[in-house]
Structures are given as structure tokens and as C-alpha cells.
């Protein structure tokens, strides 16, 4: 199977969202192949369709003072933080055509990150039957939140590599109050090459979803 890859580098959330929408519509029309967008965002808190406002701690003004934007989205889930040092992946994938279903698709996204963490960083991570995402003990290392429109996915996953975990004090991540957050660097205790980690994400995404033709596009 064929996978297009779009590397946006450091990109504002709103701009990346517009890219997602454009590619989503093209995939729905069958004009492009399945596509994985990889991006790193400036600090932003996004609210999902079912977000509880009380899970944002502090006013919008206080967030702005700390350089954190606030953005409403149509993905599933509650509130999530994105920021530098976090690999964000937006799979624009025709789930209907693949016939795996949304539940299995989410499990595969979790599998991508669980395998990567185990085989490249010797970190044992797990999934939860209750809360989507990837966990190391009681701490979330990767968040997952999707939207599916006319059979095609958008939004996706966020893996904490060297993320500023102090910014998570401004929210209750994914609305789960009794769990914490962590990152690859926090667990290992030494710096991790972000570019290399980004390449690992692409490699394991391709492996788990059985893409054998990988093409980088603008």
C-alpha cells in the first residue's frame, strides 16, 4: 500500500488544521493516497467535541501570558496539550476502504507507539481499555483523538519526546484527573534526538499499517 508523508516541521495549530482539511477532502474524493502529516506545534491547548471547560485550569488570559493558545476542535476526547518536543501525527486515512473499523484503527495507532517505545527506547508502555492513548505506569506518554468524516480519519496522536511537562499544569489531560503525564526524555533522563524519533514514528506507522511505498510530498 502507498503512503504519502507530509512533514510540516514547526507549524501553528491553525495552519496545520487547514492542511488536514485540504488533504481530508482530497482523500475523500480519491485524489490522493493515504497521508500521514507529521508536525510539531507551538504551545496550544485543544478542546475536543466533548471537552469539559473545568478541565482547563486558569483563564485564557493566563494561558496567553504563558504563550499557550487555546483552540476548539471537532476531534473526539477532552482537552489536550501540544507543544515543542512533541511529535504530532495526523493520519488522513480511508478507514472505510481499509475495512478495519475505528476501534481497530485506534488500537493500531497505539501499537505504533508501544512498539516504538519498546524497541527503540526500551520503555514498556501499555494501552488502557478505558482511556485511549499510551501509558507508562500511571502516566500518559501519548494522547490519541480522532475524527472520521465520510470514512476518512483526521486529527490523530501526540507523543511526548522532550515536551515541557510543566505546561500540563494548565489542564487535566484528556479529562483524567488521577493520572499524570511523562515523556521519553523524562523517563530516560537524557536528551533524545527529536528528528530521529520522528523517523521512528514514520517507520513504525508504516510497519503496523502495512504501507510498503512511502513517498514524501510537499
Swiss-Prot record:
Positions of the catalytic residues: 174
An individual GO BP term: protein modification process
Chief location: cytoplasm
Gene3D superfamilies on file: Bira Bifunctional Protein, Domain 2
Top-rank EC class of the record's enzyme: transferase
Pfam families in the record: LplA-B_cat
The organism's place on the tree of life at top rank: Bacteria
Cellular component aspect of the GO annotation: cytoplasm
Subcellular location: Cytoplasm
BPL/LPL catalytic domain span: 30-213
Binding site residues for substrate: 75-82, 143-145, 156-158
Lowers pKa of active site Cys (site feature) positions: 140
Keyword Cytoplasm on entry: yes
UniProt EC number: 2.3.1.181
InterPro entries reported for this sequence: aa-tRNA-synth_II/BPL/LPL, BPL_LPL_catalytic, Octanoyltransferase, Octanoyltransferase_CS
Catalytic activity: octanoyl-[ACP] + L-lysyl-[protein] = N(6)-octanoyl-L-lysyl-[protein] + holo-[ACP] + H(+)
Leader sequence residues: none
MF terms in GO: lipoyl(octanoyl) transferase activity
Annotated keywords: Acyltransferase, Cytoplasm, Transferase
Pathway assigned to this chain's UniProt record: Protein modification; protein lipoylation via endogenous pathway; protein N(6)-(lipoyl)lysine from octanoyl-[acyl-carrier-protein]: step 1/2
Role of this protein: Catalyzes the transfer of endogenously produced octanoic acid from octanoyl-acyl-carrier-protein onto the lipoyl domains of lipoate-dependent enzymes. Lipoyl-ACP can also act as a substrate although octanoyl-ACP is likely to be the physiological substrate.
More info: In the reaction, the free carboxyl group of octanoic acid is attached via an amide linkage to the epsilon-amino group of a specific lysine residue of lipoyl domains of lipoate-dependent enzymes.
Protein name: Octanoyltransferase
Gene that this sequence comes from: lipB
Amino acid at each position: 500500500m502507498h503512503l504519502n508523508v507530509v512533514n510540516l516541521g514547526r507549524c501553528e495549530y491553525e495552519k496545520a488544521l487547514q492542511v488536514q482539511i485540504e488533504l481530508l477532502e482530497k482523500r475523500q474524493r480519491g485524489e490522493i493516497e493515504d497521508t500521514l502529516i507529521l508536525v510539531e506545534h507551538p504551545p496550544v491547548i485543544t478542546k475536543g467535541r466533548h471537552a469539559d471547560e473545568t478541565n482547563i485550569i486558569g483563564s485564557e488570559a493566563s494561558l496567553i501570558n504563558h504563550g499557550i493558545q487555546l483552540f476548539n476542535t471537532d476531534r473526539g476526547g477532552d482537552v489536550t496539550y501540544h507543544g515543542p518536543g512533541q511529535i504530532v501525527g495526523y493520519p488522513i486515512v480511508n478507514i472505510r476502504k481499509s475495512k478495519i473499523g475505528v476501534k481497530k484503527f485506534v488500537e493500531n495507532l497505539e501499537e505504533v507507539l508501544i512498539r516504538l517505545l519498546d524497541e527503540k527506547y526500551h520503555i514498556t508502555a501499555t494501552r488502557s481499555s478505558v482511556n485511549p492513548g499510551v501509558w507508562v505506569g500511571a502516566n500518559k506518554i501519548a494522547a490519541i483523538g480522532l475524527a472520521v468524516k465520510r470514512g476518512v480519519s483526521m486529527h490523530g496522536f501526540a507523543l511526548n519526546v522532550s515536551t515541557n511537562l510543566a505546561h500540563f499544569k494548565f489542564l487535566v489531560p484528556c479529562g483524567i484527573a488521577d493520572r499524570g503525564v511523562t515523556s521519553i526524555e523524562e523517563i530516560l533522563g537524557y536528551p533524545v534526538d527529536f528528528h530521529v524519533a520522528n523517523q521512528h514514528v514514520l517507520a513504525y506507522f508504516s510497519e503496523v499499517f502495512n504501507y510498503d511505498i512511502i513517498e514524501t510530498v510537499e
